[in-house]
C-alpha cells in the first residue's frame, strides 16, 4: 500500500504523452477527481491499522504533490507551444496602411448654442441654467400666465402632477436669477424644453435660448439694437429684419422678429418684448425704477436656417451621414 512508485511512474508517462490541454485535463480528473485514483487510495486507508495510516497517508500526499507539479509544468509547456504555433501562423504585414481614425465633431445644436453664447458673452451677459422639472410658479405664475391660458393644458404641457411639469420654456431660469441676484443684470438661459408637439418642424423636446436685461432706463430701442446686432453676427451678414407686434403674457409691448430669406420671404426667428411690470411687481422689483427686455429663440430653428436643414427631426436621429457634415 505504501509503495506507489509504479503508480507515480505511470502518471508521469501519461502526463508526458498528453498532446494538448484537453487531454491533460482528462488525466487530471482521472487522478484528482471525486472518483479518481487518489480518492480510491485515500478510501483504502481505513483498511490499514492505526499505526500504519500516518505513513501511508504521507506517501499518498507526496505522490499527489509530485503529480500535480508535473501537471502544472506540462500545462505551461503545452500553452507555450500553442502560442508559438499561433504566432507563426499569424503573419502581420507591417507594410499595410493603418486604419484612419474617425474623428468626432460637435453636434449642430451644440455649435449653434456656442455661437449664440459667444455673442452675448461679449455683450456682458452671463449664462445661467435651471431645473428641467419645473413648478407652475416659475413656469407660469411668475411669468404672468393666467390659470386659464391654453399653454397650461395637458395638450401642450407634460405634467407630472398638479404642480410639477417638464418646463415649456427657459423663462423660469430668468425668474430664479432675478430672485437670487436682483437688478441690474444681463443673463441668457440656454436649455432643453418640452411641449406636446411632433411633426416636420416641431419635436416634443427642443432647445431654447432666452435672454433678459434688467436695469434702469432700458427701452425698446435697446432691445431692437441688441437683436439686430445679434442677427447680423449670427448670419454673418446684414439681413433685412422687421419687428411685428405680437402678444406674450410676460412682455408688454411684445414683438416677433422676422428676417428676409434669399428667396425674398419673411421668416420668424425669435420673440421679444419689454418685461411686463406685473412680473417685476411679483418679484418685489420696483417697475417705476427698473425696466428691461426679454427675448427667446429656438436653437433648432436658427440651426435649420444657418445650415439649410429642412427637417427638424434630422437633429435627433443621430444619422452619422448627417452629423459628419458639421465637423
From Swiss-Prot:
Gene Ontology MF terms: ATP binding; magnesium ion binding; phenylalanine-tRNA ligase activity; tRNA binding
PROSITE patterns reported for this sequence: AA_TRNA_LIGASE_II
One GO BP: phenylalanyl-tRNA aminoacylation
Record's subcellular location: Cytoplasm
Cofactor: Mg(2+)
Primary enzyme class: ligase
One cellular component (GO) term of this entry: cytoplasm
Family named by the database record: Belongs to the class-II aminoacyl-tRNA synthetase family. Phe-tRNA synthetase alpha subunit type 1 subfamily.
The protein, known as: Phenylalanine--tRNA ligase alpha subunit
Organism annotation: Hamiltonella defensa subsp. Acyrthosiphon pisum (strain 5AT)
Lineage: Bacteria, Pseudomonadati, Pseudomonadota, Gammaproteobacteria, Enterobacterales
Protein encoded by which gene: pheS
Amino acid at each position: 500500500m505504501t509503495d506507489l512508485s509504479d503508480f507515480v511512474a505511470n502518471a508521469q508517462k501519461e502526463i508526458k504523452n498528453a498532446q494538448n490541454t484537453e487531454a491533460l485535463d482528462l488525466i487530471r480528473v482521472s487522478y484528482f477527481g471525486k472518483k479518481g485514483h487518489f480518492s480510491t487510495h485515500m478510501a483504502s486507508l481505513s483498511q490499514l491499522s492505526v499505526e500504519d495510516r500516518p505513513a501511508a497517508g504521507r506517501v499518498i500526499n507526496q505522490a499527489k504533490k509530485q503529480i500535480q507539479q508535473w501537471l502544472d509544468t506540462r500545462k505551461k509547456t503545452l500553452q507555450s507551444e500553442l502560442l508559438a504555433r499561433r504566432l507563426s501562423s499569424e503573419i502581420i504585414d507591417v507594410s499595410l496602411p493603418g486604419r484612419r481614425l474617425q474623428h468626432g465633431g460637435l453636434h449642430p445644436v451644440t455649435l449653434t448654442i456656442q455661437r449664440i453664447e459667444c455673442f452675448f458673452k461679449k455683450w456682458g451677459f452671463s449664462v445661467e441654467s435651471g431645473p428641467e422639472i419645473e413648478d407652475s410658479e416659475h413656469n407660469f405664475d411668475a411669468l404672468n400666465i393666467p390659470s386659464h391660458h391654453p399653454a397650461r393644458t395637458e395638450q401642450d404641457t407634460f405634467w407630472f402632477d398638479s404642480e410639477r411639469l417638464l418646463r415649456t420654456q427657459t423663462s423660469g431660469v430668468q425668474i430664479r436669477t432675478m430672485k437670487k441676484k436682483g437688478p441690474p443684470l444681463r443673463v441668457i438661459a440656454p436649455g432643453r424644453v418640452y411641449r406636446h408637439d411632433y411633426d416636420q418642424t416641431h419635436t416634443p423636446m427642443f432647445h431654447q435660448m432666452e435672454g433678459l436685461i434688467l436695469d434702469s432706463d432700458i427701452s425698446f430701442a435697446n432691445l431692437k439694437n441688441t437683436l439686430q446686432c445679434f442677427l447680423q453676427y449670427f448670419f454673418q451678414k446684414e439681413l433685412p429684419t422687421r419687428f411685428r407686434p405680437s402678444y406674450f403674457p410676460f412682455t408688454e409691448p411684445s414683438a416677433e422678429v422676422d428676417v428676409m430669406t434669399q428667396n425674398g420671404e419673411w421668416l420668424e426667428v425669435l420673440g421679444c418684448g419689454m418685461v411686463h411690470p406685473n412680473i417685476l411687481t411679483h418679484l418685489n422689483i420696483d417697475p417705476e425704477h427698473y425696466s428691461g427686455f426679454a427675448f427667446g429663440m429656438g436653437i433648432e430653428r436658427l440651426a435649420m436656417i444657418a445650415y439649410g436643414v429642412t427637417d427638424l427631426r434630422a437633429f435627433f436621429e443621430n444619422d452619422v451621414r448627417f452629423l459628419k457634415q458639421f465637423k
